[in-house]
Amino acid sequence: MSPDTTVDGLRILPTQHSVSQVLQRVESLARARGLTVFAQIDFSGDAERAGLTLRPTGLVIVGNPKAGTPVMAATPTVAIDLPLKVLAWQDAEGKTWVAYNDAEYLRARHGFPAALAKNISALDALAAAAAAQDP
């Protein structure tokens, strides 16, 4: 996978951080930006508890009802993709990646007005900041 790509509506960014570090950074940055952190899912931990093996993989669910509600009011089907999610995983080579749904992809998928895409575009800056190397 090449750095900073969009594949089938997923924005994918490389990071030097571990999966757990990325997820912690997403939570911290989301709260600092006034977003609600609804949940963090540790898929690899869940797999381990089930007696299975999965490379480090996790998801943070974040949102802002003031931003998401107008989008859902305009096009109820977008609720299947909201709240917004940030996925972090480690690949077979040990590289860590961060992915999230591109706002324009969600707009095209659900057909809500283009003016509302900005309401769900917060993940562009949030994911980039979470993936970025500290100065």
Q: Which positions does each model-derived feature cover?
A:
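Terminal, regulation- and interaction-focused segments at domain boundaries
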Residues: 1-33, 132
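Well-ordered alpha/beta subsegment
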Residues: 108-135
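Beta-strand/loop substructures that line and gate deep hydrophobic ligand-binding cavities in soluble
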Residues: 85-113
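Amphipathic alpha-helical hairpins
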Residues: 25, 38, 49-50, 97
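Compact, glycine-rich, soluble single-domain proteins
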Residues: 39-87
